[in-house]
């Protein structure tokens, strides 16, 4: 029996920030628990509809992320509702990564990432 997730932002409250940008991956820590996004990165899209974007809070363990029950594929606009301050980053190319600093500003960490880890 499938379970229904109780998203922090109900569907009817979602705003339209972006259209037609594809889908992304995000865990329940963002969409259900409402913990602020602190790490985003973009990989090469795996399909026509994949934006390549991945969003995380930074609190997720490897075990948590390995459990498909706690992760989902969502329209990019849905996830951007949880961190609209990242909209200006969405046109960044694949193999780009950002994390928030102690002031909440996005810092480009693309050169600090071992991209082999993600594949």
Could you say what each language-model-derived stretch is?
Residues 2-14, 76-81:
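Short, basic/low-complexity N-terminal boundary segments at the transition from targeting/disordered tails
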Residues 6-15, 54, 62-65:
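Short low-complexity stretches enriched in small and charged residues
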């Amino acid at each position: 029996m499938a379970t229904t997730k109780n998203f922090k932002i109900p569907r009817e409250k979602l705003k339209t920030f972006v259209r037609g940008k594809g889908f992304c991956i995000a865990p329940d820590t963002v969409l259900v628990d409402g913990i602020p996004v602190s790490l985003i990165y973009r990989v090469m899209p795996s399909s026509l509809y994949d934006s390549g974007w991945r969003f995380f809070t930074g609190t997720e363990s490897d075990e948590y992320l390995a459990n498909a029950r706690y992760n989902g594929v969502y329209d990019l606009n849905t996830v951007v509702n949880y961190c609209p301050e990242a909209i200006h980053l969405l046109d960044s190319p694949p193999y780009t990564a950002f994390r928030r600093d102690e002031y909440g500003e996005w810092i480009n960490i693309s050169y600090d990432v071992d991209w082999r880890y993600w594949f």
